[in-house]
C-alpha cells in the first residue's frame, strides 16, 4: 500500500508489493525494487537504486545515487549513501557517503566517515574468523561473507578500512591510516582510551543534529559500561 500523503516524482519506478508511509518524498530517477517497505517521513533523493526487499524506517534519508541491495534494514532517522548490501543499521546512524558496507550490523548513533569501506570477504574466499567475547579469542564463523559488527556510538574517520569479520565495541573513535585490529575494545580512541566526558560531548552534538535528547539513562548506561571496561 502506498499512502496518498506521499510525494513521488513521476519518473520514479516503483516495483510490486512496495509499501510507502505518509509524508515520504521520492525524487526522480529512483528505482525501488519489489518487496520494499518504506516508513513515514522518509526522503529518497535523485538516482537512488533500491533492490528489494529492503526496509527504510521512519525518517530515514537515502542520498543521491545510493545503491542499496536486498536484505538491508535502515533504522529510524538514519542517513545512508554509497553502496550497502545485506546489512542492518540501527536507529540514528549515518553512512551518508561513498564507500561499501556489506554483511554488517551497525549499532545506533554510529557515524561512518566518507569513503569508509568494509570488507565482507577474504581474498582467499575462505571462511572468516570473528571475535568471541566469551572465549576472548577469534573463532571460525563458518561464513564466507561477514563484514563488521559495530557497537553503539562508534565513529569512523574518512577513508577508514575495516577488515572482514571486524568487531568494534561501544563508543569508539576509529581513525587509523591502516586497518584497525579485527577486535577493537569498547571506548577506544585510536590506540588509546576514549575520555568519558569527551564521549558525552560528542554524543550530545550528534543528538542535536538528529533532533533528539541525550537522556540521563543513556549517559548512565554508557558510564556503567565504561567502568566495566577499566
Predicted regions and their residues:
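Extended, small-residue-rich solenoid/repeat segments and analogous flexible loops
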Residues: 1-37, 41-53, 58
Amino acid at each position: 500500500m502506498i499512502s496518498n500523503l506521499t510525494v513521488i516524482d513521476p519518473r520514479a519506478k516503483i516495483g510490486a508489493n512496495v509499501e510507502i508511509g505518509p509524508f515520504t518524498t521520492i525524487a526522480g530517477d529512483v528505482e525501488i525494487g519489489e518487496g520494499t517497505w518504506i516508513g513515514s517521513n522518509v526522503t529518497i533523493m535523485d538516482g537512488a537504486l533500491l533492490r528489494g526487499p529492503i526496509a527504510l524506517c521512519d525518517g530515514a534519508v537515502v542520498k543521491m545515487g545510493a545503491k542499496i541491495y536486498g536484505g538491508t534494514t535502515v533504522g529510524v532517522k538514519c542517513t545512508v549513501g554509497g553502496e550497502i548490501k545485506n546489512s542492518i543499521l540501527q536507529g540514528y546512524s549515518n553512512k551518508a557517503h561513498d564507500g561499501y558496507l556489506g554483511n554488517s550490523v551497525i549499532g545506533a548513533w554510529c557515524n561512518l566517515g566518507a569513503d569508509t569501506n568494509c570488507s565482507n570477504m577474504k581474498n582467499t574466499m575462505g571462511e572468516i574468523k570473528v571475535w568471541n567475547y566469551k572465549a576472548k579469542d577469534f573463532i571460525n564463523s563458518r561464513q564466507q561473507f561477514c563484514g563488521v559488527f559495530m557497537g553503539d556510538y562508534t565513529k569512523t574517520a574518512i577513508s577508514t578500512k575495516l577488515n572482514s569479520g571486524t568487531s568494534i565495541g561501544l563508543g569508539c573513535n576509529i581513525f587509523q591510516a591502516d586497518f584497525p585490529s579485527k577486535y577493537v575494545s569498547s571506548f577506544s580512541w585510536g590506540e588509546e582510551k576514549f575520555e568519558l566526558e569527551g564521549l558525552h560531548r560528542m554524543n550530545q552534538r550528534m543528538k542535536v543534529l538528529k533532533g533528539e535528547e541525550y537522556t540521563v539513562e543513556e549517559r548512565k548506561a554508557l558510564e556503567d559500561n565504561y567502568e566495566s571496561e577499566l
